[in-house]
């Protein structure tokens, strides 16, 4: 029984001694806190002399670029604010308190520099969570609260969606001037060690710079962090630019459709409606500003003018296609030479047989010769035969009438075919013309933006 009893005492004695150790640490911290904050006034600057300046070492660490709102010109970020300063009232000798070199206390319990974001857009200028601070035995106070900011940012959407934005965040003390609180930049570069990538934007550069704002005799220091952002254009390229390019080349194919088809105007009108829908989509994205026109807006405007002209040209071509000698004057000689002979060869079209001639002139000589022969024959025929000749002459007149009618119909048919061929030539001309204009316009509009976007990689 004795060994078992001794074993129980030993087991029970171990946690008792450990608890005593824990209690001593807690008691030391409790005594230290009572010592530090006895008579501590958090509303008073912790300096030895009234003319001393508190140097606040300030740094920024970005954890996430949440959103870049071009419409409202806002940038939303999640950051950590690194702040470090010396509080002369919070010093102690670690040997007097069980070797405690640092403690963590609520930030509401001690003096804090009132550093805020000046370009705040949602009214929450402090924006940070009141986390605990680390107080060291030499009086150094380290506070790194997380914060979520919505800052104003002037957007330049000239090269949208291949644009770059330069947004800034300016931090400074709200009430203290430079003689009371001075800001010192910890690191020129923003800490991006734990940065969570954004799917639409990438940060090319993020640097801080100290500045001073003069207000009379007082100087107010501030630190400005500039973020150079570049948009990743893959989404807009696939779902906005490529469809617009397709619609522009679809407009060119309007001139490849035969004029007999009634779908030429329907296709052009459908393309125009589609472009209007794309324009409404872009209007929801970009800010409503009259200073600059975005690149994609210029391109859509160019294509809409392009399609409108194609509709006008198509109406004219269809009008030419349905011309005939019964509704219009005969084709002018220069039109025949240009559109039936010269242009088809230049456009690599099949030769058109020019059968466009006047039927009255072709049959005038045979008719005259027939009447002369008839007169000669009438002198040599008897009276009985004259009756037969008269009958035959009436039959010949009827045949000539039918022949003239058939030739006239054939003549009208040839005129119609000639005008249709002219319409085909016009279609081919405008096909090549619109294709060249479409390709050239697309290259001229997008080349500067692509150069700038690719240059940012170097």
UniProtKB/Swiss-Prot annotation:
SUPFAM superfamilies: Neurotransmitter-gated ion-channel transmembrane pore, Nicotinic receptor ligand binding domain-like. Its main location: membrane. GO terms for molecular function: acetylcholine binding; acetylcholine-gated monoatomic cation-selective channel activity; channel activity; heterocyclic compound binding; transmembrane signaling receptor activity. It catalyses: Ca(2+)(in) = Ca(2+)(out); K(+)(in) = K(+)(out); Na(+)(in) = Na(+)(out). It comes from the Eukaryota. Residues 22-237 are extracellular. The keyword DNA-binding does not apply. Residues 1-21 form the signal peptide. Residues 321-428 are cytoplasmic. Component of neuronal acetylcholine receptors (nAChRs) that function as pentameric, ligand-gated cation channels with high calcium permeability among other activities. nAChRs are excitatory neurotrasnmitter receptors formed by a collection of nAChR subunits known to mediate synaptic transmission in the nervous system and the neuromuscular junction. Each nAchR subunit confers differential attributes to channel properties, including activation, deactivation and desensitization kinetics, pH sensitivity, cation permeability, and binding to allosteric modulators. NCBIfam families: LIC. Belongs to the ligand-gated ion channel (TC 1.A.9) family. Acetylcholine receptor (TC 1.A.9.1) subfamily. Beta-3/CHRNB3 sub-subfamily. This is Neuronal acetylcholine receptor subunit beta-3. It comes from Homo sapiens. The lineage of its organism: Eukaryota, Metazoa, Chordata, Craniata, Vertebrata.
């Amino acid at each position: 029984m004795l060994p078992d009893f001794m074993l129980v005492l030993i087991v029970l004695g171990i946690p008792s001694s450990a608890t005593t150790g824990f209690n001593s640490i807690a008691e030391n911290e409790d005594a230290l806190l009572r010592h530090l904050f006895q008579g501590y006034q958090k509303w008073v600057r912790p300096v030895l002399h009234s003319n001393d300046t508190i140097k606040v070492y300030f740094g920024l660490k970005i954890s996430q670029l949440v959103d870049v709102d071009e419409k409202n010109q806002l940038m939303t970020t999640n950051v950590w604010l690194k702040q470090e300063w010396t509080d002369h009232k919070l010093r102690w000798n670690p040997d007097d308190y069980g070797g405690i070199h640092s403690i963590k206390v609520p930030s509401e319990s001690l003096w804090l520099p009132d550093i805020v974001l000046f370009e705040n857009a949602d009214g929450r200028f402090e924006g940070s969570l009141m986390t605990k601070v680390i107080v060291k035995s030499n009086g150094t106070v380290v506070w790194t609260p997380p914060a979520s900011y919505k800052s104003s940012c002037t957007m330049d959407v000239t090269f949208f969606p291949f644009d770059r934005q330069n947004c800034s965040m300016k931090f400074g003390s709200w009430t203290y001037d430079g003689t009371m609180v001075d800001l010192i930049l910890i690191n020129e570069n923003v800490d991006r060690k734990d940065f969570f990538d954004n799917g639409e934007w990438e940060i090319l550069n993020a640097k801080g710079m100290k500045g001073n704002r003069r207000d009379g005799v007082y100087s107010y220091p501030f630190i400005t962090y500039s973020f150079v952002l570049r948009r990743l254009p893959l989404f807009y390229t696939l779902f906005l630019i490529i469809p617009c390019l397709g619609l522009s080349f679809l407009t060119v194919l309007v001139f490849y459709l035969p004029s007999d088809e009634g779908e030429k105007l329907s296709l052009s009108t459908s393309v125009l409606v589609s472009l209007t829908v794309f324009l409404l989509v872009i209007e929801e994205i970009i800010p409503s500003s009259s200073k600059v026109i975005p690149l994609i807006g210029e391109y859509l405007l160019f294509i809409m003018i392009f399609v409108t002209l194609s509709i006008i040209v198509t109406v004219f071509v269809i009008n030419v296609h349905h011309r005939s000698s019964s509704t219009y004057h005969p084709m002018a000689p220069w039109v025949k030479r240009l559109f039936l002979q010269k242009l088809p060869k230049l456009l690599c079209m099949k030769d058109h047989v020019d059968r466009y001639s006047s039927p009255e002139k072709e049959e005038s000589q045979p008719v005259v010769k027939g009447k002369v022969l008839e007169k000669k024959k009438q002198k040599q025929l008897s009276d009985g035969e004259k009756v037969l000749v008269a009958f035959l002459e009436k039959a010949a007149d009827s045949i000539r009438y039918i022949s003239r009618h058939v030739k006239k119909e054939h003549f009208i048919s040839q005129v119609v075919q000639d005008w249709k061929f002219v319409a085909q030539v016009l279609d081919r001309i405008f096909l090549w013309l619109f294709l060249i204009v479409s390709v050239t316009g697309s290259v001229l509009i997008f080349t500067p933006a692509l150069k700038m976007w690719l240059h940012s990689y170097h």
